[in-house]
Regions:
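Catalytic cores of DNA base-excision repair glycosylases
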Residues: 1-215
Length: 216
């Protein structure tokens, strides 16, 4: 959570190499349980393993705490995976949000990518900014408000692609302080579809959509 893909992927790969089946070469991979391995992990060693993700001391504590809960309540990572994929999505989301260290975006990503719940649209800072700036969601909508709009308007089968594409669009075009539209209509592929809420092209002033003055 709160880590870019560029930083999180190497950390994930290192974690799996040390604590997953790759890091347990003497053991049948079917017998390796990631939750049990993380629950028993040395915190300093785990922190060093995921250092590329940033905030590694805090995240290592969170991972161990979550792994301990999974083992205590479900018995194994596999059993928890079954819970995520087979139980009612609302119940799964509620359970995830009850876990300290898991926020709405992380919970929704688990539902979408691990649980196979196609109609879930995770909202990170990019998604929250883009769809209010576009005028798709109300300018004062919080993360949950934006999620509700997107899950209502976007076809379920497209939510996963739209989520990842939106993040890329936010990084390349619809940035927080200097969106591409300030360079002119040709600079942004969605220029003609966007209300540009909070963006003043004449002064180049950019504010959060919630702070923008909307003309009647």
């Amino acid at each position: 959570q709160n880590t870019s893909d560029v930083a999180s992927q190497p950390a994930h790969d290192a974690l799996m190499a040390r604590y997953g089946s790759e890091g347990n070469g003497d053991t049948d991979s079917a017998d390796v349980d990631l939750a049990a391995a993380l629950a028993a992990a040395d915190r300093a060693e785990l922190a060093d393993t995921i250092a590329s993700a940033g905030l590694y001391n805090q995240k290592s504590k969170t991972l161990i705490r979550l792994a301990e809960r999974v083992v205590a309540e479900y018995g194994s990572a596999a059993a928890f995976d079954s819970f995520v994929t087979e139980e009612d999505p609302a119940a799964v989301r509620s359970t995830l949000l009850d876990m300290k260290g898991v926020g709405p975006k992380t919970a929704d990503c688990v539902l979408l990518f691990s649980g196979g719940q196609a109609g879930v649209f995770p909202v990170d800072t990019h998604v929250h900014r883009i769809y209010r700036r576009l005028g798709v969601a109300p300018p004062d909508a919080d993360h949950e408000g934006v999620r509700e709009v997107l899950e209502r308007e976007v076809p379920a089968a497209k939510c996963g692609f739209a989520h990842t594409a939106s993040i890329q669009f936010g990084r390349e075009y619809c940035t927080a302080r200097k969106p591409a539209c300030l360079e002119g209509p040709e600079a942004c592929p969605l220029y003609d579809l966007c209300d540009r809420v909070g963006v003043d092209e004449e002064t180049s002033e950019v504010v959060d959509p919630a702070e923008a003055t909307v003309d009647d």
